[in-house]
Amino acid sequence: MDQEESRVISIFETLGAYFINIFYNFLYKNALYKKHSIVTEYQYQVKGYILGVKQNKKLYEKMLDSFYKYFCNITQINSKTLNFSNFVSTIVDSFIPKEYSQSISLEKKESILELLLCDYISNLGTFITTEKMLPFIIKNRKENYHKVTKEMQDYSLTFLLKKRMELYNKFLRKQAYVEPETELEETYARLSSYNRSLLHQIEELTSENKSLLADLSTLRKKYEKRQSEYRRLVQLLYQQIQRSSTSKSSYPLTKFIETLPSEHFSNEEYQKETPADQKEVVETELLRKQELLTSQELTSKSPNNYPVPHSRTIVSKPSDNYPVPRSRTTKIDFDNSLQNQELHTKNGFSEKDIVEFSQDKPEEENILAIKQDNPEEEDILAIKQDNPEEEDILEFNQDKPEFNQDKPEFKEAVLDIKENILEEENQDEPIVQNPFLENFWKPEQKTFNQSGLFEESSNFSNDWSGGDVTLNFS
């Protein structure tokens, strides 16, 4: 061990002896005068002393002055030779390297000494109040005096040497660090680094903002496109409903339009707030137009689009869907006549014999005369002449010469057929009106006479001298 190290250890042992005396003797005596238990009171005294030295400046100065006097007495150095500033320098120089001792001012040395002493007192007081040391300090003090003080001195010297090593390392690290020339340069360097970090954050936020603006523009375009499509669809829906409204029982068009959002509807009539009376007038007008459209659609969809009949006879060409007023001789009669002709053919009668038989009847001549005067009936006869079934029957009769027309059986069969026809003519058949014509043409009370025609006035029936008119339907 060199001389410098022995000097340092001597100073550390002197420092430890002073504070061990305070903890072991002075604080113990103060604990005896209190009413609480000695152990508890001693712990309070130790904690109070540590806090007082750290927090109370006057108590610290008083403690330091007492230690200065103790140090002078132990070292046998005259106080005039070792003043207080030299005392502080001597204690601090034992903890720091020599090359830094002269560069440190007295004020910094005093602050270093204060930190060292406060840290040392705190650790020593904690060690003394442990369960290992506290019983030896309170009980059997005389027997345990040397043992307790020896352990306290060893702990004190170990802690001070450890603290000296820490301060040495700090000064060496500080020597390797190049300090800035002035505080202004240090502040500038710190702010420059912070400014660079802020600029980097600004760039990131700017790029993110541009990306969000681009997304917003895309969404706005999509929104405008869908709004335009929505308005177009609403307008088409309005037009479609206006065309397809067909009856009074349908949902009123104005009520449906009022449920649509007005800001997306281009019809100005419904965007404006109109009075209730005006809305009723508009709705009534729309319903009237709907009825007119309905009637036109039904007329256009009717079979062959029949006009209202203007002649004295019923329409000669009925539709397949609606029945018409029938005369005493209808299509059913015509079918029956065809069946009778087939029956005559089977019985050996030809159509020629039937015609000769009918020439003896003046009533049938009148019927033919009436048919010749009626142009519409001529069309019906023309249709009958074109019937292929009758032509086939005539051809069949001509091919059968074996049938004798002068047989008495033939004449009896003709009489039976005539009686059947008269019985069928006397039967009253119901006259059915066409419901389709009733919707568009409602004449006054018209009646049908025995000829199967309806009478419009009294003069109409007087024009006919007699005879029945037979209507044949193909």
Swiss-Prot record:
Induction notes from the record? Expressed in the late phase of the viral replicative cycle.
Domain of life per record: Viruses
| Localization of this protein | Host membrane
| Glycosylation sites per record | N73, N83, N195, N209, N449, N459
Q: Indicate, by first and last residue, each region the UniProt record lists as having compositional bias (Polar residues).
A: 294-305
Q: Hey, what's the signal peptide range on this chain?
A: none
A Gene Ontology cellular-component term: host cell membrane
Q: Where are the transmembrane segments?
A: 7-28
Q: How does it sit in the membrane?
A: Single-pass membrane protein
Provide the alphabetized UniProt keywords: Coiled coil, Glycoprotein, Host membrane, Late protein, Membrane, Transmembrane, Transmembrane helix
For the region Disordered, give the residue spans. Answer: 294-324
Where do the coiled-coil regions begin and end?
183-233
Q: Which family does it belong to?
A: Belongs to the asfivirus B475L family.
What is this protein's name? Uncharacterized protein B475L
